Amino acid sequence: MTATAEKTAGRVVRITGPVVDVEFPRGSVPELFNALHAEITFGALAKTLTLEVAQHLGDSLVRCISMQPTDGLVRGVEVTDTGASISVPVGDGVKGHVFNALGDCLDDPGYGKDFEHWSIHRKPPAFSDLEPRTEMLETGLKVVDLLTPYVRGGKIALFGGAGVGKTVLIQEMINRIARNFGGTSVFAGVGERTREGNDLWVELADANVLKDTALVFGQMDEPPGTRMRVALSALTMAEFFRDEQGQDVLLFIDNIFRFTQAGSEVSTLLGRMPSAVGYQPTLADEMGELQERITSTRGRSITSMQAVYVPADDYTDPAPATTFAHLDATTELSRAVFSKGIFPAVDPLASSSTILDPAIVGDEHYRVAQEVIRILQRYKDLQDIIAILGIDELSEEDKQLVNRARRIERFLSQNMMAAEQFTGQPGSTVPLKETIEAFDKLTKGEFDHLPEQAFFLIGGLDDLAKKAESLGAKL
């Protein structure tokens, strides 16, 4: 699906870090986003450098962003216009392998060269092709299914500062989707730690779900051009599974903030005037180009889960604030919840979903979720009084509510598949019906006699009965 044209050659006239200016013959200037190739030799190393056209400067000059380090590139080197934009391999063959933003296989060099290739710059589906129905994606995680239900074919964000469990929750979702639904997943590692990418590769192989997952990495040590394009490369692979094979695909992006950050670096390198807080003036446009392609078409979908790093825990920062506009559900991971040892460390009061509506999830689900939120909100309101005067100064009704809220908090925790090797406890999947039933009983006080510890890091009602019995209590 990539267009080809007669190849023309230019020469490098200026190099400033990852920014390269190339001069072409008059009338042969390459189009914006075209990929250019330069053959360079650096010591004993010979390699092909890929550049992407970012600006037309006039006088047959183009300004490009390099997708690899420019070590060894010198003025006067010949640069060839490929006549097409960067393209990546697509199809079933990409599953079980790791690729970079250019579509080169990292675990098996040379693999995938003969596959069908699609351009990473594509238009979103036409409005008439979009899926009009809204459907819930059941995950088996109690806190998610009850309070922030995910939309099939929607965009879900995991917000949180550093070290609160965003990557672990993404690994958990890959595990659950592969084991419980047998779906295809595509993982985009955008500007994150190389160590985490290696850990994910090993864990997916150990869990026997690597065969259903394609991984595309552009990590922290890569130039900004690569980090800016790696999400588009992964999305292109996911679009093939959706459009050509009619599959429901899960796209994981870790971390969408690094996509914005790379765009900011590229914008500065290109000499654009910075916008608010130093971000690029095209921030909303670049985010929209990515997010609009992540959608459901009739009968098939791409559901995306995006980790969003929040700089200094500031939610008014333009990067997370711009992401908010595109989301169907937000799961906020909180340091306060994390410090209590509750995992996943989801803040139920700060998280939200557009489909927590009786018309979509049903009256009973909505009623139970709202009652849980009411109890937790009241508990939060009472925290100052408890801290100053102590719990004994509360009314009997409030004491009962506080005890119930503490049980709800602990019951929202769950043993996870991604943490099995650390906890020694198998991960649990709780059906939505059982989750609603359990929390309905909990809010009505049917479990008030059970010790708080019985609710901690367990699955459903069967687990609760076993834990309670081990602590000398009965349901």
UniProtKB/Swiss-Prot annotation:
Q: Which GO terms describe its cellular component?
A: plasma membrane; proton-transporting ATP synthase complex
What Gene3D superfamilies does this protein map onto?
Answer: 2.40.10.170, Bovine Mitochondrial F1-atpase, Atp Synthase Beta Chain, Chain D, domain 3, P-loop containing nucleotide triphosphate hydrolases
Recall the GO molecular function terms of this protein's record: ATP binding; ATP hydrolysis activity; proton-transporting ATP synthase activity, rotational mechanism
InterPro entries (alphabetical)? AAA+_ATPase, ATP-synt_VA_C, ATP_synth_F1_bsu, ATPase_a/bsu_AS, ATPase_alpha/beta_chains, ATPase_F1/V1/A1_a/bsu_N, ATPase_F1/V1/A1_a/bsu_N_sf, ATPase_F1/V1/A1_a/bsu_nucl-bd
Record bears the keyword Phosphoprotein: no
Extract the PROSITE patterns matched here.
ATPASE_ALPHA_BETA
Residue span of the signal peptide, if any? none
Q: Which CDD domains does this UniProt record tie to the protein? A: ATP-synt_F1_beta_C, ATP-synt_F1_beta_N, F1-ATPase_beta_CD
Where is this chain's protein located in or outside the cell?
Answer: Cell membrane
- Pfam name, any one: ATP-synt_VA_C
Q: What does this protein do?
A: Produces ATP from ADP in the presence of a proton gradient across the membrane. The catalytic sites are hosted primarily by the beta subunits.
**Quaternary structure (record):** F-type ATPases have 2 components, CF(1) - the catalytic core - and CF(0) - the membrane proton channel. CF(1) has five subunits: alpha(3), beta(3), gamma(1), delta(1), epsilon(1). CF(0) has three main subunits: a(1), b(2) and c(9-12). The alpha and beta chains form an alternating ring which encloses part of the gamma chain. CF(1) is attached to CF(0) by a central stalk formed by the gamma and epsilon chains, while a peripheral stalk is formed by the delta and b chains.
This chain's protein is named ATP synthase subunit beta
Q: Which gene encodes it?
A: atpD
